[in-house]
């Protein structure tokens, strides 16, 4: 990346290449005559960007755009993108891709956010969005006489406000590193079915989810930094709302409605983060028509097994777990990769290229290219290949959703509590699909 920076706080972008050689090397990757960024040049670029971004403050004041991007409406998002396009003379920006509110935009995560715009354009916008989010951090005391969160109010195009009853926080001193939510720690806390169902809330009500990232590097005078954004596994607070009680019980009866916001905050940190099942972004193709302005009154209960039993429109001969039905059950909107894999794994006709190994929730991609081809067809991405598919699988590793089985090629395992969500044990599914344990076992 090259940058020409004046004495004024402006930035001219000449050329860039977005390359992730460490994780996804590709022999046919286009190369350009662009010198490598050194630590000093990166710092120069960062400072130039920050100086230029400061001009957005006047635009915020002029248009009444909230400081916290998670509180932006679709109009605010559009105004922000328009400002960036004019400020940096950006080309090739498709404004239609940014038709979402601020909460959905911030929830995308870097990889998927970058897909919204051309290479260097997306990098610039993401850098600015991160800066805006960090600037909105405010401290709240959590020790002593003020153990509860103050009542928090959130607004968006579709959603209403909710108060948080309290949050139980794990003392940071028990861990040696700032990013201490390690795989081993998460594994000690298997995710419950109630938390699986909170996917519904995370997707239907993105702007009202509370995140409390109590990182050790933010500790100052017994204060923690608390931000309002979608929960990620980086936090370590177990929140609960006034009526929904979090306990490790796998009871669906305790959930009053999929479409209420009684359980907006869950133990996403000390347990596997199932909002990760939706990818960061759980909002790819976030369309307002998929998220009704009024809360539905129906109150379905039970497992996915119960859900499909009452669906006469489902073909009983084709997969046991249709991805579309599972997406509807969890409220995820567009079909996600984990749902698609479950569909293939429960379809007898797909056993030649993907199947259960017979060992619990472990499965094998016998023909990974065919799996990738079908995923690309489902998502209308004809260039999909296994390298790209595996990128999504890798994302699930540190979220304790899916793990790669060591020493076995193309073998993975669901490590989350699928049984409580689906209502099937792995043995039941194996029997229904005539799965025989692998001879290699």
From Swiss-Prot:
InterPro entries: Ets1_N_flank, Ets_dom, ETS_fam, Pointed_dom, SAM/pointed_sf, SAM_PNT-ETS-1, Transform_prot_C-ets, WH-like_DNA-bd_sf
Residues annotated to bind DNA: 335-415
One GO CC annotation: nucleus
Positions of region (Helix HI-1): 304-312
Domain of life: Eukaryota
Alphabetically ordered keywords of this record: Acetylation, Cytoplasm, DNA-binding, Immunity, Isopeptide bond, Nucleus, Phosphoprotein, Proto-oncogene, Transcription, Transcription regulation, Ubl conjugation
Modification after translation (UniProt): Sumoylated on Lys-15 and Lys-227, preferentially with SUMO2; which inhibits transcriptional activity.
Positions of crosslink type Glycyl lysine isopeptide (Lys-Gly) (interchain with G-Cter in SUMO2): 8, 15, 138
Annotated stretches, region: Helix H4: 418-422
Activity control mechanisms: Autoinhibited by a module composed of four alpha helices (HI-1, HI-2, H4, and H5) that flank the DNA-binding ETS domain, reducing the affinity for DNA. Phosphorylation by CaMK2/CaMKII in response to calcium signaling decreases affinity for DNA.
Region entry Helix HI-2, spans: 323-330
Pfam families: Ets, Ets1_N_flank, SAM_PNT
Domain PNT: 51-136
Cross-link Glycyl lysine isopeptide (Lys-Gly) (interchain with G-Cter in SUMO) per UniProt, renumbered positions: 227
In-chain residues carrying the UniProt-annotated modification Phosphoserine: 251, 254, 267, 270, 282, 285
Residue numbers spanned by region Helix H5: 426-432
Function according to Swiss-Prot or TrEMBL: Transcription factor. Directly controls the expression of cytokine and chemokine genes in a wide variety of different cellular contexts. May control the differentiation, survival and proliferation of lymphoid cells. May also regulate angiogenesis through regulation of expression of genes controlling endothelial cell migration and invasion.
PANTHER family named among the record's database cross-references: ETS, ETS TRANSLOCATION VARIANT 2
Protein name: Protein C-ets-1
Species: Homo sapiens
């Amino acid at each position: 990346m090259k940058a020409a920076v004046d004495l004024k706080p402006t930035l001219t972008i000449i050329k860039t290449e977005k390359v992730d050689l460490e994780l996804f090397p590709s022999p046919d990757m286009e190369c350009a005559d662009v010198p490598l960024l050194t630590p000093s040049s990166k710092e120069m670029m960062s400072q130039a960007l920050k100086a230029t971004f400061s001009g957005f403050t006047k635009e915020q004041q002029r248009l009444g755009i909230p400081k916290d991007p998670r509180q932006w409406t679709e109009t605010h998002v559009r105004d922000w993108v328009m400002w960036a396009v004019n400020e940096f003379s950006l080309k090739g920006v498709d404004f239609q891709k940014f038709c979402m509110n601020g909460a959905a935009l911030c929830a995308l995560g870097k990889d998927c956010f970058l897909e919204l715009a051309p290479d260097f354009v997306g990098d610039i916008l993401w850098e600015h969005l991160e800066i805006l989010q960090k600037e909105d951090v405010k401290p709240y005391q959590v020790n002593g006489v003020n153990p509860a969160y103050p009542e928090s109010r959130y607004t968006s195009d579709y959603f209403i406000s909710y108060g948080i009853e309290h949050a139980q926080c794990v003392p940071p001193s028990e861990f040696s590193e700032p990013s201490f939510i390690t795989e081993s720690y998460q594994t000690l806390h298997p995710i419950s079915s109630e938390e699986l169902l909170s996917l519904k809330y995370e997707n239907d009500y993105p702007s009202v989810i509370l995140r409390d990232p109590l990182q050790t590097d933010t500790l100052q005078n017994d204060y923690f930094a608390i931000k309002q954004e979608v929960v990620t596994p980086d936090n370590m607070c177990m929140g609960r709302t006034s009526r929904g009680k979090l306990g490790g019980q796998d009871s669906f009866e305790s959930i009053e409605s999929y479409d209420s916001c009684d359980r907006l905050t869950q133990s996403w940190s000390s347990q596997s983060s199932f909002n990760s099942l939706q990818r960061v972004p759980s909002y790819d193709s976030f369309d307002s028509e998929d998220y009704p302005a009024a809360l539905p009154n129906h109150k379905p209960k039970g497992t996915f097994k119960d859900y499909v039993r009452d669906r006469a429109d489902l073909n009983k001969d084709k997969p046991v777990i249709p991805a579309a039905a599972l997406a509807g059950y969890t409220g995820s909107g567009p079909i996600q990769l984990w749902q698609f894999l479950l569909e293939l794994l429960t379809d007898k006709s797909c056993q030649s290229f993907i199947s259960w190994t017979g060992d619990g929730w472990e499965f094998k991609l016998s023909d990974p290219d065919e799996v990738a081809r079908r995923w690309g067809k489902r998502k209308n991405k004809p260039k999909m290949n296994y390298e790209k598919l595996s990128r999504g699988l890798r994302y699930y590793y540190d979220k304790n959703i899916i793990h790669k089985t060591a020493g076995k090629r193309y073998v993975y395992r669901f490590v989350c509590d699928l049984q409580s969500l689906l209502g099937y044990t792995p043995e039941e599914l194996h029997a229904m699909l005539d799965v025989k344990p692998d001879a290699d076992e």
